[in-house]
């Protein structure tokens, strides 16, 4: 579908289709959305596989390890007794093929800004930081060598009561000051929404 309309594509770590198959079907460079694991060797293996598949950039997802409120989820009582672990367990994802995922978590809360440099040591892909919502973090991303940022709140589900991403743009644009591209996602439902984001300084939506 993306190929048919000439649209760019970013493939998630959680994709149910192998990155090589998606890249071949798209017939143009795609990007890889990385959920960093708490085992660096596995993260490196995923980066190198994505690059070998033809990905030209990686979007490092940083907005999930936050202290999100999970009280409602903890109270959930399922009436359906079917086991859905086949859908959600790590080994089921094609990107993990050949990797030892026992005990591996997809949210590495120990990440620091140094991860940008570490990633650049093991891949030639451009490194973008996905999940930036404030100007301070945007400036730090530039300072530590990020090639771009994605203003994102993960659809609003990672941290509750956050601002809409378009509301975050002005301070982020000011902090970046044209030094790297700024992409924004979330809540864009019509063309006029896109024009608003571009007029506020986003490079792309």
PLM region spans:
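Active-site cofactor/substrate anionic-group-binding motifs, chiefly glycine-
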Residues: 1-14
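Beta-hairpin (beta-strand-turn-beta-strand) motif
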Residues: 14-16, 35-37, 63
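Short catalytic-loop micro-motif centered on adjacent basic/acidic residues
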Residues: 9-11, 31-34, 127-129, 183
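Alpha/beta enzyme core
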Residues: 4, 21-25, 38-184, 191-205
